[in-house]
Swiss-Prot record:
Part of the Tol-Pal system, which plays a role in outer membrane invagination during cell division and is important for maintaining outer membrane integrity. GO terms for biological process: cell division; protein import. This is Tol-Pal system protein TolB. The lineage of its organism: Bacteria, Pseudomonadati, Pseudomonadota, Gammaproteobacteria, Aeromonadales. Pfam families: PD40, TolB_N. Keywords: Cell cycle, Cell division, Periplasm, Signal. The Tol-Pal system is composed of five core proteins: the inner membrane proteins TolA, TolQ and TolR, the periplasmic protein TolB and the outer membrane protein Pal. They form a network linking the inner and outer membranes and the peptidoglycan layer. Its main location: periplasm. It is found in: Periplasm. It comes from the Bacteria. It comes from Aeromonas salmonicida (strain A449). Transmembrane segments: none annotated. Gene3D superfamilies: TolB, C-terminal domain, TolB, N-terminal domain.
Amino acid sequence: MIRKVFFALVGCLLLSQSAQAALDIVITGGIDSARPIAIAPFKWEGNGQLPQDIAEVVSNDLMRSGKFKPLARGQMPQTPSSSGEINFAPWASQGVEAVVVGSIAAVGDGTYKINFELVDVLKGQLAKTQGGESNGYILDSRMATIPGAQMRQFAHRISDIVYERLTGERGAFLTRIAYVSIEQGAQFPYQLRISDYDGYNEKTLLRSREPLMSPAWSPDGSKLAYVSFENQKSEIYVQDIYNQQRSLISSFRGINGAPKWSPDGRRLAIVLSKDGQPDIYVIDVASKQLTRVTNTRVIDTEPAWMPDGQTLIFTSERGGKPQIYSVNLATGVTRRMTWEGESNQGASVTPDGKSMVMVTRVQGQYRIARQDMESGAMLVLTQSALDESPSVAPNGSMIIYATIYQGRKSLALVSTDGRFKAVLPTSSGEIRAPAWSPFLN
């Protein structure tokens, strides 16, 4: 049982989608309690087709966070392109709290000028009713001139601005995900790739004839640690995503797996079986100095760091079934963290250190759950039968994970409050082991 669990977890826990498949979002959970907002289509001041539907990108970003419920275009009472064109009453009557308006103009040489405003509907309605000249209802206003190739990135930037102004929290829409793509029958079936968080702008970092597993981002977002079988055994490498340089970190006898970076970027928590059963170790990336953390007769696996860099959480079956435990690196004191559900595994800690996200087993089905670190209360976020490999956005608002959708492995998103769920179906092959990057700017 434990070996089956271990290899299912450390082996190839995850799933999902191709960059093109990210275009197709299937909404599987509602956001009725989210905040109503509207992103009006940006006015196109140029010839030919609009180069990028910025409003659609922003709308999708905000919807995926689970905190906002964008108004459908067909329900919009008007399509203003500036705050001065907004008739606030009909927006307010639909409960819309804020409206994003903007325009795109071609300025030549493949560059574009983009203007946008974030407008508070209630404040705007009060200002117009009282006849004042104040524009205090404009929460943010920006203008930028950018190359056409950067237009989608700028749309994510708008999403970050809107998200932060309305929630007080930093947006995570300009982040990336790393994953392993598998295309059976290809010359190099296994590929390590990165893309924008929504699957666009995909880039291949490594191609291999042998399995690749468990990518993990360094805290500065410049490197990936991962497991490779290119030499007919599991080994852990670190690769720079910009210059492609890589170094071998761990190549001991037996299993070398499940690397996770420490918050300071100097160490990796890893799993080794060089002395028998798989145990947790910490290795210094520069010196390769190795420190053993656990030493038991059962399998300890899937380490993850607490934000303080002094504590690890990990999966262990020492209590009879897989559960989450913590260990203090200085004292060695270990304690069990999870008690609900039939089993719990594959945990990571949210950036604020207040929650754990994990795979929980409920009535034989594997689902994504979040547990409060202080109270121990658990919230099951998904209702599928085989959800795996959750990875949390750097602002803690969203989780990317693997699931089965219509009989195929697919990548999925769920907000950390469970209010929004979406599946990104794959059209060919499969994607495993997604990992969400830290903030990149």
